[in-house]
């Protein structure tokens, strides 16, 4: 059963300007180590960061809180499954909020779709509760 849906559209140019202005201060506050490593390897790092930023915003909306109530950018990270499919890893307040949404006997699954077409990056998040195995 679907328990949360969120989407976000991010202007890559805005992220590019933020990277130029704040650099590591922005990336270390907003992104996980894994996200920083992956984005810094990309030829268009602003696009990579923008997709991840959109994913965090979309995830916070799917959690039903936005970026408040203990849900912070640093508590959500884009990770890839062994197949390469992207998903979200949650910690702290984001993980606590997710746990509170899931009915007893169910396990959460976070589906993530990312895309970009300059100057925009977009993310969709669907949080599903499936029977625990």
Curated annotation (Swiss-Prot):
Catalytic activity, reaction form: apo-[ACP] + CoA = holo-[ACP] + adenosine 3',5'-bisphosphate + H(+)
Binding site for Mg(2+): 8, 57
Enzyme class: transferase
Domain of life: Bacteria
GO MF annotation: an example: magnesium ion binding
BP GO annotations: fatty acid biosynthetic process
SUPFAM superfamilies: 4'-phosphopantetheinyl transferase
InterPro entries the UniProt entry points to: 4-PPantetheinyl_Trfase_dom, 4-PPantetheinyl_Trfase_dom_sf, ACPS, Ppantetheine-prot_Trfase_dom
GO cellular component, one term: cytoplasm
Entry cofactors: Mg(2+)
Main location: cytoplasm
Gene3D superfamilies hit by this protein: 4'-phosphopantetheinyl transferase domain
Keywords tagged on the record: Cytoplasm, Fatty acid biosynthesis, Fatty acid metabolism, Lipid biosynthesis, Lipid metabolism, Magnesium, Metal-binding, Transferase
Disulfide linkage: none
EC number: 2.7.8.7
Subcellular location field: Cytoplasm
Function: Transfers the 4'-phosphopantetheine moiety from coenzyme A to a Ser of acyl-carrier-protein.
Recorded family membership: Belongs to the P-Pant transferase superfamily. AcpS family.
Protein name, UniProt field: Holo-[acyl-carrier-protein] synthase
Organism expressing this protein natively: Caulobacter sp. (strain K31)
